[in-house]
Amino acid sequence: MSATLRDVALMAGVHTATAARALSEATRHKVAASTRAKVEQSATKLGYMAHAAAATLRTGRSGFVGMLVPDLANPLFAPMLKSAEARLRTKGWTILIAQVAPHEEDRLTALRTLITKRVDGLILATSQSNDPILTMAAQHNIPTVLINRGLGDRRFPCVVNDDNESMRLTIAHLKDLGHQHFLHLSGPRNSSTGMARLEGFKRWAGSKHAVVEAGNFTRDAGYQSMRAHLLKTPSGCTQTAVVCGNDLIALGAIEAIRESGGDVPNDFSVVGHNDTPFMDLVSPALTTVHVHTDLMGQEAADVLVQRMQAPTSAVPASRLLHPDLVLRDSTAKPRTQKVFKPKR
């Protein structure tokens, strides 16, 4: 027969409630170290394992937090996941991670699965404009925090990078080098980050400059959009600097430039966004905007814990994180020729 919490308490010589507090990550700090050690030793000797369903009935919480991310292979999300998990673990919660496809029904299915696990809260890195998963989360009264993407909906606090500041830093750097003609390869416009960076680009570069929607935050999308832009004008390309929606788009753009007979940075300066791992090891090393993704995960966890512990209180304020521009080898002074004619 499996050991119970009462068995652990009897062996340790403490009240059952004290044993429960000592074995919970969220409350163990409230128990004296010597008492906690006795309880933990007793639990180990008896082979005690907490029963999740019983704990839920006792506390009204499952101890689980759901986190939805669009692409686990994207290195942007690893630091967010790691820091959010570490922070929540210290507060007594375990993260359940779901990777969701862009299709609406797949996203809803993933959220339904988390709801059946009775998650106490959600961290969403997948939010889009008019996203049905937010409607479902609200219908089930699940405390929810948006990470990396914000929608301006006061019901859902967000922890995001200051994308306007990202573009200010980027354009200021390129103008300091002497660039006057810019191209923006934006992310998808149904993404809040894609739109925020596009708006920041227009604000600091001006609305007269060329914008091409990459359609996705991938290397292939960057390649296809840059290649199409280079080939669409028979007389050649007048832009000298390419501002990209993220680092993967930038890598695709560099590939397309090289394939067309161009060079980075001699023919085009290219700037990425996010400073994902290994951008210092590509050739040329990528000038990019560093987003503090580890801090983003930590802050999102803190905001969510605040929401879960006081669900009826005022919604916490969203948090805007300041980026940094990392200068590397993919930017230089503009080429001397006014027009770049691609190899076809």
What are the residue ranges of the model-derived segments?
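Periplasmic-binding protein-like
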Residues: 118-126, 183-186, 212-213, 234-246, ...
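Short helix-capping segments at alpha-helix termini
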Residues: 90-91, 140, 204-210, 233-237, ...
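Flexible loop/turn connectors
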Residues: 231-344
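Alpha-helical structural signal in soluble globular domains
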Residues: 42, 83-87, 133-136, 140, ...
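Hinge/beta->alpha junction and helix N-cap segments in small-molecule ligand-binding domains
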Residues: 52, 70-79, 97-106, 158-169, ...
